[in-house]
Amino acid sequence: GISKKIIEKRKKEILKVSNLFKFKKTFQLKLPANRLDTISLDVLIKKIKKICDQVKPELIFLPFEKDIHTDHFNVSRATQACIKSFRNPYIKKALAYEIISETNFNFMKGEKFKAQTFFDISKFLKMKIKICEIYKSEISKHPFPRSILSIKSLAKLRGSQSGFKAAEAFQ
């Protein structure tokens, strides 16, 4: 697990980011960080489903299913269980995102992340970097994967693959 001090620090970081984006609402599920494998998948499904029913999103972003991080894997599985179109007709599309420090670190055989959908973030890259810098508990110096240089480099790579100056990729 993660220490209470780090959890409190992350809560403050999330609040700063939420304020910067001017989100109307954020949801704190109060589940054990880095320990979602210790709770029933059903518990996670119910919590995510409750939010989906409340928000009724048309577009869902979820972690890539083969992400090496156990929490990301469990969130992806639970979210997929929640977003079946026959139960949630308001959901039009779901896209899996890549997480620079986790998605491509699965060295086992199996499905790898395939960049299939790109969003142009050229106008927002500076803002993305500013937001990433708020997450001091997650960012470190290069060559750490979650460095500012790595984040910019991935955005430029995805941009070059899609005809933009900078992009984010989804599957």
Regions found by a protein language model. Give the residues of each.
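The feature marks non-catalytic terminal segments
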Residues: E13, V17-K25, I91-K92, A96-Q171
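Short histidine/acidic/glycine/proline-rich micro-motifs that form metal-
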Residues: G1-K4, P32-D37, E65-T70, K136-K141
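Short, well-ordered secondary-structure micro-motifs
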Residues: T38-S40, H72-F73, F105-K109
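Conserved residues at the C-terminal ends of beta-strands
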Residues: L29-P32, P63, Y97
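Active-site adenylate/phosphate-handling loop in enzymes that bind or generate adenylated species
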Residues: K47-K93
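Active-site rim/loop-helix segments in enzyme catalytic domains that contact anionic ligands
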Residues: G1-V55, S85-N88, L154, Q171
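An alpha-helix initiation/capping motif
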Residues: E8, F73, P145-L149
